C-alpha cells in the first residue's frame, strides 16, 4: 500500500483534497523558506522560486515518513506567492504589511504562482520526482476602507500568500480570476493530476482511499 501525504499545514489545501475525494496523511514541513529563497539568489525567476520551495517542502518530510515507518508514499508539497510589480509576496504576517499590500493591489490584477512537487517513494527511496508551477491571474476589487479594516481585523489575510483568500472572506474582494481556482486556494488539482501521472499514479486510485492508494 502507498500512502498519500500532504506536506503542508494549510487547512485550505487539505479542504481542496478532501472535496476532491482524497483524505491525505498530513506531515508538516519545517523548511526555512527565507533560507531557500536566499540560496536561490536575487536573480531567480519567480516561477523557479515557488517550485523550489515546493520541492524543498516535499523533501523535508521524507525523514519524518521514515521515522513513522511509511516507506511507500506519494508526497505532495506546494508553495504559493503573489507576483505583483515584479515582486514576489508571501504571507504578510502583520496588519500593517497586509494593509500596505492591499493598498498596492486594490483595483489591479496580479499573478498567483503556486509551485507543486510530487515525490513517489517506494521501499524508502525516491523513485519518481515531478514538479511544476501554476499561474493564475487574480483581478482584485477596491474594497471600501471600512470593509478592508474589518477584513484585516479577522486575521485571515495575515497568514496567506498575497494577503487574500479566494475560498473564504477574501473572496468578497476578488472580482474574477483567469486560471485554475484550486491553484489560488493553494493546490491545483489539474496540475497535481498531471504530476501524479508522471510518477505513475492515477487520480481515480485516490478517490476510494483514506490516505492510501493501492
Curated annotation (Swiss-Prot):
GO MF annotation terms: nucleoside triphosphate diphosphatase activity
Subcellular location: Cytoplasm
Protein's GO biological process: nucleotide metabolic process
UniProt-annotated catalytic positions: 79 (proton acceptor)
EC number, as in UniProt: 3.6.1.9
Entry superkingdom: Bacteria
CC cofactor: a divalent metal cation
GO CC annotation: cytoplasm
CDD domains: Maf (cd00555)
UniProt record similarity statement: Belongs to the Maf family.
Alphabetical list of NCBIfam families matching this protein: maf
Its biological purpose: Nucleoside triphosphate pyrophosphatase. May have a dual role in cell division arrest and in preventing the incorporation of modified nucleotides into cellular nucleic acids.
Protein name: Nucleoside triphosphate pyrophosphatase
